[in-house]
Amino acid sequence: MWVALILSFAMQGLHGADPAARTIAQDDMSAIDEPRQVVARTRTDWESLWRAHGSNQPAPKVDFSTESVVAIFLGSRPTPGYSAHFLRAGLKDKVLTLEWAERRPEADSIRAQVMTSPALFAVIPKFDGEIKFQKVSP
């Protein structure tokens, strides 16, 4: 299965329209306000992560027999307009590396002065090996 995963990532990237990495939730106000990247491979881990995130919505459904959840928490930001997105993935020495970037608001844009804690949740095809997150410049 991981060969198909890597080929899919390499050919299409990890954008929201890519079926290999499906965004299941995105939020500007996570209760997790420290930068963190997380993999949830079980329903128990996912429910615990979702509770820590602090959403008042039910956790999105995930089929853990075929999928894993990957999440990025940016930590506290001074204004709205920040978000994370996946760029691509690569497999080397049995380690799956997920490259991601942070989007920032335009420097000259007018924004509310309110603290945010952006979070991104996506599902990827199940991968039992080590998963690393690598932040890159867009």
Where are these regions (language model features)?
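Sec-dependent signal peptide recognition
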Residues: 1-7
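Exposed, flexible binding/inhibitory loops of compact, secreted disulfide-stabilized domains
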Residues: 9-138
